[in-house]
Amino acid sequence: MLQTHLQETREQVSRLEKIVQQSVGKLEPKRSKPMAALIDEARELVDDAKNDPVRDVIILTACQRIEYYEIAVYSAVCNFAEIIGETEQFGLLKKTLEQENNANEALRGLADSANTRADRAA
């Protein structure tokens, strides 16, 4: 599941680059501070995990938190593109938003199983 989403993410980057080129030309990439904070926190929690099942839950929870953040951002820019009449950009962003929602659903299923395993290991 994570490998599939990694490939989707690469496609999303290409779509975003296309949108940026159409809108403003060239844009210098910047590191997202909120995303970096989510990743840093996840690393700390993984390092403190007491066993593998708990570590799995932490990783899946971190992935879901990242998905929630991405869904919020893509929802906002998707809505904005629709409001200002950018039909092509709206379509590209909507596809990305759908992929993020699908990834979140898949993570939810994995998290349910991981939580059960962690509970048994406790």
Residue ranges and their predicted role:
Residues 1-122:
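Amphipathic alpha-helical hairpins
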